[in-house]
């Protein structure tokens, strides 16, 4: 796609699942990819896999809930690869529980990862983008943040916050050459979803959910990188502040 070759991109949560698929695709498009994740073994593997294909990638270990750790990781990536042109905020975590069965410690962990984490990364990276007059951001939220999701009250609140954050920053930063958009995945075959659907009862729920999806399947990580690449490309230069659902038709809006 136009405008991706030789750009630098930072992908949080890029060691596994959707993030790894995004990292691979953007490397194929000619980007220099920085993978920011806590899983060092998987992150090194993805970076090595990309490099083995003749593309450019590096792994940078950081906990996105730690502002200083994020700042150091971004500094390390930029020192080696140049200023960040693109940011994909993808990292996230959840565990399915009804809200009344949860406690404040659980809320804090979910909020730290799914809301404060992207806030930390965005605050560090967007300063440079605004100063340079160019930047593109794709935030990976969730349809849980648009329409709610039983068993994911706090996670849904965080993802709704990311949607609102994206729209607000799109307004604040458009004059500085920075555009931001949100992708909201529906149910996707990742470690998080599989943890929700364990056991016989989980299998029953999974089959019912698939029947509710017009395409009759869960998403897979490879369903998202093409849209991410488009939103970062020059072909999407007039698109900002938008929220796009990718759910096989489970949720429709517009």
Task: Locate each region found by the language model.
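Short C-terminal tail/terminal secondary-structure segment
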Residues: 147, 229, 240-254
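Alpha-helical segment proximal to the catalytic Tyr-Lys
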Residues: 127, 171-175, 237
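Residue(s) in the substrate-gating loop at a strand-loop-helix junction
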Residues: 142
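The beta1-alpha1 cofactor-binding region of Rossmann-like NAD(H)/NADP(H)-dependent oxidoreductases
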Residues: 40-41, 61-73, 104, 222-223
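Active-site helix of classical SDR
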Residues: 122, 158, 166
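Substrate-binding pocket helix/loop in short-chain dehydrogenase/reductase
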Residues: 98-99, 106-111, 209
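Active-site loop immediately N-terminal to the catalytic Tyr-X3-Lys motif
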Residues: 100, 147-153, 175-176, 216, ...
């Amino acid at each position: 796609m136009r405008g991706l070759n030789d750009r630098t991109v930072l992908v949080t949560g890029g060691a596994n699942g959707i993030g790894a698929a995004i990292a691979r695709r953007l490397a194929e498009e000619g980007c220099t990819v920085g993978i920011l994740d806590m899983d060092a073994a998987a992150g090194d593997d993805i970076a090595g896999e990309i490099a083995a294909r003749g593309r450019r990638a590096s792994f940078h270990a950081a906990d996105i809930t730690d502002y200083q750790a994020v700042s150091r990781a971004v500094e390390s990536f930029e020192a080696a690869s140049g200023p960040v042109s693109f940011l994909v905020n993808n990292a996230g975590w959840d565990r399915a529980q009804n809200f009344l069965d949860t406690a404040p410690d659980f809320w804090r962990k979910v909020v730290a990862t799914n809301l404060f984490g992207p806030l930390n990364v965005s605050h560090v990276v967007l300063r440079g983008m605004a100063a340079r007059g160019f930047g593109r951001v794709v935030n990976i939220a969730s349809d849980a943040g648009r329409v709610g999701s039983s068993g994911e009250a706090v996670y849904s609140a965080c993802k709704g916050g990311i949607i609102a954050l994206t729209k607000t920053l799109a307004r604040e930063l458009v004059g500085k050459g920075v555009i931001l958009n949100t992708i909201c995945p529906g149910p996707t075959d990742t470690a998080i979803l599989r943890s929700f659907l364990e056991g016989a009862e989980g299998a029953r729920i999974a089959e019912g959910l698939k029947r509710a999806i017009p395409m009759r399947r869960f998403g897979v990580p490879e369903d998202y990188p093409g849209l991410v690449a488009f939103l970062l490309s020059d072909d999407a230069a007039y698109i900002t502040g938008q929220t796009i659902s990718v759910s096989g038709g489970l949720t429709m809006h517009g």
